[in-house]
């Protein structure tokens, strides 16, 4: 997400979030000088929400709908600042970058190290794998290097086909439409992106060994 970007639209609120906000305002009016125990307050709100009828909840659901419309409208007009990660979304259909010979070696030997040393941290595991890899002879490394070369060759063919397909589809569509509506799936995309980044970072750490 665009951390620190003051122009980024405020996130949309759920019907329950509006309900909690209303409860908080009511509590402040009744007890202006008393502090709120957040955990206890949240529990009470949750219990109260469960006992409410659909008719009582509809007021908050309407508020959530109008806030969602506001958010979608603002996101369509929102332009992320240059360098913002969300400006270049990863296409889930894009071919995945091939692993290196070392990464293939790690994938094969990591489970063994984890079973032998269950308390070992990720960093220490990566370090141990790096040491093991450096101790391998050129002959022992060869199967991994051959497999990595084949995967790289396949990736290069796949990415060329993917890019060619992207260009032809862009030509058919003509001038691009605003893609702000895609932002609805932003939290899920972020999680995927973070997972992929964790993998990439681990691979980079291992390559440095």
UniProtKB/Swiss-Prot annotation:
Disulfide bonds join 23-45. SMART domains: HMG (SM00398). Pfam families: HMG_box, HMG_box_2. Expressed in gastric and intestinal tissues (at protein level). The modification Cysteine sulfonic acid (-SO3H) is found at residues 23, 45, 106. Gene3D superfamilies: High mobility group box domain (1.10.30.10). Keywords: Acetylation, Chemotaxis, Chromosome, Cytoplasm, Disulfide bond, DNA recombination, DNA-binding, Immunity, Inflammatory response, Innate immunity, Nucleus, Oxidation, Phosphoprotein, Repeat, Secreted, Transcription, Transcription regulation. Residues 52-76, 107-117, 137-150, 162-172 have a biased composition (Basic and acidic residues). GO terms for molecular function: chemoattractant activity; cis-regulatory region sequence-specific DNA binding; damaged DNA binding; DNA binding; DNA binding, bending; DNA-binding transcription factor binding; double-stranded DNA binding; four-way junction DNA binding. Multifunctional protein with various roles in different cellular compartments. May act in a redox sensitive manner. In the nucleus is an abundant chromatin-associated non-histone protein involved in transcription, chromatin remodeling and V(D)J recombination and probably other processes. Binds DNA with a preference to non-canonical DNA structures such as single-stranded DNA. InterPro entries: HMG_box_dom, HMG_box_dom_sf, HMG_boxA_CS, HMGB. Residues 165-180 are annotated as: Required for chemotactic activity. Interacts with POU2F2, POU2F1 and POU3F1. Component of the RAG complex composed of core components RAG1 and RAG2, and associated component HMGB1 or HMGB2. Component of the SET complex, composed of at least ANP32A, APEX1, HMGB2, NME1, SET and TREX1. Directly interacts with SET. Interacts with LEF1. The gene is HMGB2. It comes from Homo sapiens. The keyword Repeat applies. GO terms for biological process: cell chemotaxis; cellular response to lipopolysaccharide; chromatin organization; defense response to Gram-negative bacterium; defense response to Gram-positive bacterium; DNA geometric change; DNA topological change; double-strand break repair via nonhomologous end joining. The modification N6-acetyllysine is found at residues 3, 30, 43, 90, 114, 141. Residues 9-79, 95-163 bind DNA. This is High mobility group protein B2. One of its GO terms (cellular component) is perinuclear region of cytoplasm. It comes from the Eukaryota. Its main location: nucleus. It is found in: Nucleus; Chromosome; Cytoplasm; Secreted. Belongs to the HMGB family. Reduction/oxidation of cysteine residues Cys-23, Cys-45 and Cys-106 and a possible intramolecular disulfide bond involving Cys-23 and Cys-45 give rise to different redox forms with specific functional activities in various cellular compartments: 1- fully reduced HMGB2 (HMGB2C23hC45hC106h), 2- disulfide HMGB2 (HMGB2C23-C45C106h) and 3- sulfonyl HMGB2 (HMGB2C23soC45soC106so). Acetylation enhances nucleosome binding and chromation remodeling activity.
């Amino acid at each position: 997400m665009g951390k620190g970007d003051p122009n980024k639209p405020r996130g949309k609120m759920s019907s329950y979030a509006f309900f909690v906000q209303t409860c908080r305002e009511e509590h402040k009016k009744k007890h202006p000088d008393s502090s709120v125990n957040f955990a206890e307050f949240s529990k009470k709100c949750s219990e109260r929400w469960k006992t409410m009828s659909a008719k009582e909840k509809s007021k908050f659901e309407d508020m959530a709908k109008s806030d969602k419309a506001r958010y979608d409208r603002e996101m369509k007009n929102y332009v992320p600042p240059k360098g913002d990660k969300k400006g270049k979304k990863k296409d889930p259909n894009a071919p995945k970058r091939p692993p290196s010979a070392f990464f293939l070696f790690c994938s094969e030997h990591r489970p063994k190290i984890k079973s032998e040393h269950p308390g070992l941290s990720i960093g220490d595991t990566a370090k141990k794998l790096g040491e093991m890899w450096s101790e391998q002879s050129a002959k022992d490394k060869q199967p991994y290097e051959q497999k990595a070369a084949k995967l790289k060759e396949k990736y290069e063919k796949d990415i060329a086909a993917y890019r060619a397909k992207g260009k032809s589809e862009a030509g058919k569509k003509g001038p691009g439409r605003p893609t702000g509506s895609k932002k609805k799936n932003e939290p899920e995309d972020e999680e995927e992106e973070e997972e992929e980044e964790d993998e990439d970072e681990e691979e980079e750490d291992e390559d440095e060994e």
